């Protein structure tokens, strides 16, 4: 499961069809996230352009080697901070997965926060389905 978290393909799968991410810089997504900044174009429901965002990937170190962490400390012209920390830990034959998100968007923060709540609820449903199916992406094409 942790290997899946490292892939843009998983982001695409769990965000769809609510949000789509198209790479701008670099022009293609890597197979696995490397630390760095990835500019993307966002579309709501795959059709309505809602701007661009920087996905800023790091892999924070933790004292407990059993805990995996991936941070997207992203931002956009309207959202000064979209700090998303994923932690995952193998526990009793399963995986304990957590999302933590901090958002700052000035006067737009309440609206962005509401959208984020809806988006992460959607992601969690999609995650659960994928995990239950052994991360079988079906006919979706790799990014």
Where in the sequence are the language-model features?
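Hydrophobic ligand-binding cavity/cleft-lining segments
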Residues: 1-35
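Surface-exposed, charged secondary-structure patches
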Residues: 41-44, 54, 59
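Short, surface-exposed coil-to-beta transition loops
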Residues: 50-56, 80-85
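A conserved amphipathic terminal alpha-helix motif
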Residues: 102-143
């Amino acid at each position: 499961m942790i290997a899946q978290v490292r892939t843009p393909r998983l982001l695409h799968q769990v965000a769809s069809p609510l949000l789509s991410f198209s790479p701008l810089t670099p022009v293609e997504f890597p197979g696995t996230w490397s630390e760095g900044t990835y500019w993307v174009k966002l579309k709501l429901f795959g059709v309505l352009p809602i701007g661009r965002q920087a996905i800023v990937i790091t892999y924070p170190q933790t004292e407990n080697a059993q805990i995996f962490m991936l941070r997207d400390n992203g931002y956009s012209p309207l959202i000064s901070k979209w700090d998303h920390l994923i932690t995952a830990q193998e526990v009793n034959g399963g995986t304990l997965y957590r999302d933590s998100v901090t958002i700052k968007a000035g006067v737009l923060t309440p609206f962005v926060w509401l959208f984020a709540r809806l988006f992460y609820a959607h992601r969690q449903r999609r995650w659960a389905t994928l995990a239950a199916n052994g991360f079988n992406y079906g006919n979706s094409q790799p990014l």
